[in-house]
Amino acid sequence: MGQGGSRTGEVAEYIRDGLDYTQWLRNFKEGLSVSTNPRQMRLDYTITMPGLLELKNMFNLSQELDTEVLTKVMFTFSNDEIMSPLSLPKDLLHTIIDEALVYMEPRATKKQRALMDVIKNLKTRETFTPTSKGKKRQLYLDKIRKQDITKILSKDKRVLDWWTSI
């Protein structure tokens, strides 16, 4: 795995506190080596706001492992749900998706179809204005978990600037 894989690991470990991405990837590859049906081993990707920055890396991982990537979007019940990709301003969300699609569309196989369909559909969904309450809640959770979301978001200055402005 190149740098993209380690970056995916960083975000995965942030989202799934306690996950050891290197061990998970080793286990996944071992599972692939003994699976007898492609439906036995598939990547499961829930797009969160920080996970949105991993679209290309998840696409690459799916291709590298030659496995399907099942894709869904984080549920959003209120505008306090700052971890939802729908908390981003619509223009920024669409730009990030469009940049990913330019990269992915010429390379995609049927194994990335769900990923492509979900992110295209994401552009049709309503976004919302996140609250400072939602940001404070996330910062509180970061403190408990001894994490820092800004380290993840700093991978894309546009997203970090948005986060800082809340």
Language model segments and positions:
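Radical SAM/AdoMet-radical enzyme domain recognition
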Residues: 1-76, 80-83, 92-93
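Short flexible/disordered coil segments
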Residues: 7-9, 65-73, 100-117
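Weak global preference for isoleucine
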Residues: 15, 47, 73, 82, ...
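Acidic-enriched, low-complexity/disordered segments with a strong bias for Aspartate over Glutamate
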Residues: 17-20, 44, 66, 80, ...
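PAPS-dependent sulfotransferase catalytic core
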Residues: 79-106
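Radical SAM enzyme core and accessory elements
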Residues: 105-166
